[in-house]
Amino acid sequence: MAIGLVGRKCGMTRIFTDAGVSVPVTVIEVDPNRITQIKTLETDGYQAVQVTTGERRESRVTNAQKGHFAKAGVAAGRLVKEFRVTEAELEGREVGGTIGVDLFTVGQIVDVTGQSKGKGFQGGVKRWNFRTQDATHGNSVSHRVLGSTGQNQTPGRVFKGKKMAGHLGDERVTVQGLEIVSVDTERSVLVVKGAIPGATGGDVIVRPTIKA
C-alpha cells in the first residue's frame, strides 16, 4: 500500500490535446489532508498514516473525536481515512502536518475509490444485463422477468449467489489505472483521465496504483 489523498469529486469535463483529440477528464478537489495520527509497528502492530479533510460543525463532533483531533492539533474534519504505508513513506511525516496535491505528478497512474451512485431496487435486466424475453410470439407480461431460477426436480432449489433482482449501486467501487492529466497546486485540484465512481460532491480516495 501507499499513501494517498482524500478529495471530493467536482464533476467531469474535457480537455484537448495538442493533436486536437478530446479527452474526458474528472476534476477532483483536494483540500489539504491533515495528519491526525501516525501508527507504527511498536504501538499499533502496523504502519499507517491517518488523515482528515474538510470541516465539520463542532456540534456534530463527538467528545472522543474532539479529544483525538485536539491531541493532533488539527481542526475537526468531515471524515477520517487511513493509508497503510512503509517505513520509508513515514519519513518526513508528522502529526499535525498536511499532505497536498503535490504528492502526485502529471502522468502518474492512480487508483480512485468512491461510493457508487445508488440506483435503488432494480430488475435483472438493468442490474445484471440479462437479455429480455421475446417482445411478441405469444409472450405477455414476462418481457423483462428472469425466467427459471431453480431448475426442476434436480436440484429443485435456487443456488446461493444466484443473480436476481435487488438493490443496485451505493457500494464501494475502485477504478484502477487512471492517468493524472493535471496537478494544480494553487487551486488544490487534480485532473484525472476518465470517469471515477460516485456522484458530484462525493468523497473519493486517490492513491498510487497497485498494478504499476
UniProtKB/Swiss-Prot annotation:
This is Large ribosomal subunit protein uL3. The gene is rplC. Methylated by PrmB. Belongs to the universal ribosomal protein uL3 family. InterPro entries: Ribosomal_uL3, Ribosomal_uL3_bac/org-type, Ribosomal_uL3_CS, Transl_B-barrel_sf. GO terms for biological process: translation. The keyword Kinase does not apply. One of the primary rRNA binding proteins, it binds directly near the 3'-end of the 23S rRNA, where it nucleates assembly of the 50S subunit. Residues 136-155 are annotated as: Disordered. It comes from Acinetobacter baumannii (strain AB0057). One of its GO terms (molecular function) is rRNA binding. The modification N5-methylglutamine is found at Q153. Keywords: Methylation, Ribonucleoprotein, Ribosomal protein, RNA-binding, rRNA-binding. It holds the Pfam family Ribosomal_L3. The keyword NADP does not apply. Part of the 50S ribosomal subunit. Forms a cluster with proteins L14 and L19. GO terms for cellular component: cytosolic large ribosomal subunit.
